[in-house]
Amino acid sequence: MAYTYKYPRPAVTADCVVMTREAAPRVLLIQRGNEPFKGCWAFPGGFMEMDETLEQCAVRELKEETGMEVTEDDIFAFGTFSAVDRDPRGR
């Protein structure tokens, strides 16, 4: 019999902030294709798979959403944001 969890498990996401190192820095944004916020500008990112690290998620999502290829060595933690009501889809 499969184990079931007594408590709900929150969804974990990785959002990627990509900046240039130019005199006038630029930031990479994507235009969301799905609800919520369809058509709005956002950082590339998405939900973490059960078998991947946060860094692996960031590498995968950046490639899926922009075609940009980076390695885990290119990724560093910028910040953690955990507001419960941050996403209308819930936790």
Language-model-derived ranges and their functions:
Residues 1-2, 80:
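Short Pro/Gly-enriched beta-strand edge/turn motifs at strand-loop
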Residues 44, 58, 62:
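Hydrophobic alpha-helical positions that pack around
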Residues 2-42, 55:
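N-terminal strand-loop-strand
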Residues 10-12, 55, 59, 67-91:
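Active-site segment of metal-dependent pyrophosphate-handling enzymes
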